[in-house]
């Protein structure tokens, strides 16, 4: 799930490699870089093939089809793969899980968890893969089939050079990142189980040449329900008639804005509102209907929105403010608010910063730009946030693209090579770093 502003506008084929001089690659790392280049064309073909499989979250067959295509690639590399099905009641396809333990993996080295996802926001009809020079367009090219393919390309280069023998890694590609199945304790169980057997998580959501993600805001939901006294509009505001549901909702939303809108990293958005005398609302589909007349005081209103925060404490504080605002009502009205726990936040930690430092050095050693942390407000929620409380994590290792969650979605194809090179060398270096004997997580 991508939500970020582009940091660099480029035609990635040339300009990114001139920003920083290469430092020192080992002979093995040099061979890894060459192996990525040798497999680039086949990776583009894999991207084309899987983009052309429609895989909106609720297209279960399509999600499984994309998963099968990637599973075949991982099978060829010697991974032990399985399809983790979910209960039918969740209405989700399941996840691809693949594991590898290299025969020369050093005991005590860092164990890696690689995270991708198979589903897209849009179904894909009318958004098939098209290519013009170094730019490809289509549903999922950037978010995040491009990142999945970059991950596979990196693993293939490690395998062909023998470096994969030094690595222990679990790959999880979820089938419902864009709309996670509920309850989350069920739909994210395989991801959490994998995290508990790992030391570092690497997320392959879209990235760019100069940034990576060490913090992501969490995303949760809320529903505001307001009731008023139905009556003739000529009596509105008078004792006995009151203010009506719509005026009370307007007051509440405006007070939310006044009290919360200036907090750093915190945002809230009322995405859908229906109100009147006769109201129906489907919170799952986020759609509803309303009917009334202009001379009737509205008796019912529903608002559904989201709330994004950087830390659990910030989320709790914001919810407390919202509850307090809702509890004090205009005459003749009542209101309630409920909250839905969605994607957790991923606060910045020293461990995440340490991974960023290694990634920065990898990028410069390969001749790419230095890497800095992307401001958390420029990144949406994602699966890596579920594992961040358990292990150190970094995200944004995927391809550089544009138009995510929009019909014009596309990717700069040379970034596929850049992402794979950087990920492969990063995996090798992290695997050689000893994991701490104790952890405060």
What is each stretch, according to the model?
Residues 107-173, 179, 194, 407, ...:
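Active-site metal-coordination/substrate-binding segment of hydrolases
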């Amino acid at each position: 799930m991508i939500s970020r502003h582009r940091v660099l506008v480029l035609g990635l084929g040339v300009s990114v490699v001139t920003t920083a001089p290469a430092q020192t690659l080992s002979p093995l790392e040099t061979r890894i870089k060459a192996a990525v280049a040798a497999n680039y064309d086949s990776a583009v073909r894999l991207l084309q093939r899987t983009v052309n499989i429609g895989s909106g979250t609720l297209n279960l067959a399509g999600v499984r089809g994309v998963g099968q295509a990637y599973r075949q690639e991982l099978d060829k590399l010697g991974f032990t793969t399985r399809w983790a099905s979910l209960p039918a009641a969740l209405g989700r396809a399941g996840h691809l899980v693949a594991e590898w333990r290299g025969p020369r993996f050093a005991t005590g080295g860092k164990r890696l968890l690689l995270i991708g996802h198979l589903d897209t926001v849009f179904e894909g009809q009318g958004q098939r893969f098209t290519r013009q020079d170094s730019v490809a367009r289509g549903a999922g090219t950037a978010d995040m089939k491009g990142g999945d393919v970059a991950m596979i390309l990196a693993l293939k280069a490690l395998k062909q050079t023998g470096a994969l023998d030094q690595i222990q890694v679990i790959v999880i590609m979820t089938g419902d990142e864009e709309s996670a199945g509920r309850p989350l304790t069920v739909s994210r169980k395989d991801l959490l189980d994998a995290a508990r057997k790992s030391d570092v998580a690497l997320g392959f959501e879209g990235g760019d040449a100069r940034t990576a993600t060490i913090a992501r805001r969490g995303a949760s939901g809320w529903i505001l329900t307001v009731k008023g006294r139905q009556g003739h509009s000529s009596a509105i505001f008078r004792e006995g008639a009151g203010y009506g549901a719509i005026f009370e909702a307007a007051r509440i939303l405006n007070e939310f804005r006044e009290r919360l809108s200036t907090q750093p990293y915190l945002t809230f958005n009322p995405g859908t509102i229906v109100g009147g005398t006769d109201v129906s609302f489907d919170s799952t589909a986020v759609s509803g209907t309303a009917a009334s007349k202009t001379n009737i005081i509205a008796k019912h209103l529903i608002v559904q929105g989201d709330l994004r925060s950087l830390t659990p404490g910030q989320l709790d504080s914001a919810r407390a403010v919202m509850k307090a605002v809702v509890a004090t009502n205009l005459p003749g009205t009542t209101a309630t608010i409920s909250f839905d726990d969605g994607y957790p936040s991923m606060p910045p930690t020293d461990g995440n910063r340490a991974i960023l430092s290694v990634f920065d050095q990898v990028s410069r050693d390969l001749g790419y730009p230095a890497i800095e942390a992307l401001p958390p407000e420029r990144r949406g929620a994602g699966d890596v946030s579920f594992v961040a409380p358990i292990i150190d994590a970094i995200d944004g290792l995927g391809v550089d693209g544009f138009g995510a969650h929009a019909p014009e979605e596309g990717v700069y194809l040379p970034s596929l090579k850049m992402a794979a090179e950087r990920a492969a060398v990063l995996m090798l270096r992290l695997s050689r770093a000893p994991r701490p004997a104790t952890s405060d997580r």
